Amino acid sequence: MEHDRLYNLYLTNSIYKEAFVGSWVVQECAEAVARHYLDRKRHRPAHSMRVEVINTDTMETISEYEIV
């Protein structure tokens, strides 16, 4: 994996159609960052949240997580 690339983090579900959260260089932190974001905002959805990490160079989805 290339750690020098920039990755964007998006949260989606029926409430957040596509909420841009921010950019990180290391994609492994995406799930932890998403959990922290939701806790801080007190937006804990009743159902699962899909987290997408997107490579900003190619706009391809690098990884996805389900947060319940």
Regions found by a protein language model. Give the residues of each.
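Aromatic side chains
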Residues: 7-10, 37, 65
